[in-house]
Amino acid sequence: MAGHSKWAQIKRKKGANDKKRSAIYSKHIRAIQAAVRSGGSGDPAANLALKNAIAAAKADTVPADNIENAIKRAVGAAEGAADYKEVTYEGYGPGGTAIFIEALTDNVNRTVADIRAVFNKRGGSLGNSGSVAWQFEKKGVILLSDTSEAAQEVAIENGAEDIQESVDGLEISTAPNDLYAVQDALSAAGFKPESGQITMIPSNTVAVNGDDARKLMALVDALEDLDDVQNVYTNADLPEEVEA
């Protein structure tokens, strides 16, 4: 993920070409299978990590059949199957932006080397653990195209912490543990969330424009192209024409 607007991120991924979309799907399949192994269950009702992985996959329009098959393969996987580890990295990008990266890897040395190489090539720098993590908060985020007061009331009554309205719809923020309660309440009230997932939200944003904005997006794109990288978050407030 890149930039500040979650709606812009959804549009970018939906508009990805076939090669890029295939890579996005592969990352989600890996995350789902790792969640099954780490959580010890193929049932999302009994495995929160799997439930979160499925929600993230659905947000990126991964087909239901792909998700189901990934779970089945992970449940039946042999003991010798690759054991992936969740790791995070932090760094700085053009315009003084903070970058937080989530990765899933079976070789940490390879992953950190690949990430450092991208930062060095694209005008950024890899930081130490804790250098920028404090600038982000883990939150649940629900996107809803319906901007009615009724929808907002349902969200607030069921635990929403913040609601941002734009031309695309509502971006509803929740505590991580309240995500599914709010999403289920909206669905039960007849509203249809576009997506709902756990993500990292910047506490404050930095306006980035012009050449710095283009360089930042090139850096984020290059990081997202790495097989081990699952998510890339920045605190950048980017112009719409750059995020698109």
UniProtKB/Swiss-Prot annotation:
The family database entries (PANTHER family) matched by this protein are listed as:
TRANSCRIPTIONAL REGULATORY PROTEIN YEBC-RELATED (PTHR12532:SF6), TRANSLATIONAL ACTIVATOR OF CYTOCHROME C OXIDASE 1 (PTHR12532)
The protein's organism comes out as Deinococcus geothermalis (strain DSM 11300 / CIP 105573 / AG-3a)
Q: Region (Disordered) spans which residues? A: 1-21
What this protein is called in its record is Probable transcriptional regulatory protein Dgeo_2194
Q: Which GO terms describe its biological process?
A: regulation of DNA-templated transcription
Name the InterPro entries on file.
Integrase-like_N (IPR017856), TACO1_YebC-like_2nd/3rd_dom (IPR048300), TACO1_YebC_N (IPR049083), Transcrip_reg_TACO1-like (IPR002876), Transcrip_reg_TACO1-like_dom3 (IPR026564), YebC-like (IPR029072)
Question: Where is the protein localized?
Answer: Cytoplasm
Q: Which domain of life is it from?
A: Bacteria
Q: Which UniProt keywords apply?
A: Cytoplasm, DNA-binding, Transcription, Transcription regulation
**GO cellular component terms attached to this protein's record:** cytosol
What Pfam families does the annotation carry? TACO1_YebC_N (PF20772), Transcrip_reg (PF01709)
The entry assigns this protein to a family as follows:
Belongs to the TACO1 family.
MF (Gene Ontology)? DNA binding
